[in-house]
């Protein structure tokens, strides 16, 4: 899931080397903390949050077999 998120985000942003994903996992959930360059935050969020909502949907679908709750957070 971490790799999936990184690949999707790197294809959306203009400064790819600033993409960083940190994975925190416990018994019931997985938290993926995403950080990008400040210039690219708008591209990740999208108009009315459509892009980040789509990213979260794809990551959750990819994690379906883990039976864990997946959260994607954008860090500033």
Regions found by a protein language model. Give the residues of each.
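Ordered, soluble secondary-structure elements with a strong preference for glycine-centered loop motifs
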Residues: 42-53
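RNA-contacting regions in translation and RNA-metabolism proteins
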Residues: 1-43, 57-76
């Amino acid at each position: 899931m971490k790799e999936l998120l990184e690949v999707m985000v790197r294809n959306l942003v203009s400064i790819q080397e600033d993409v960083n994903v940190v994975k925190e996992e416990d018994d019931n959930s997985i938290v993926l903390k995403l950080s990008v360059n400040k210039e690219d935050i708008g591209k990740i969020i999208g108009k009315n949050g459509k892009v980040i909502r789509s990213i979260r949907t794809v990551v959750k679908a990819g994690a379906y077999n883990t039976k864990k709750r997946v959260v994607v957070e954008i860090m500033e």
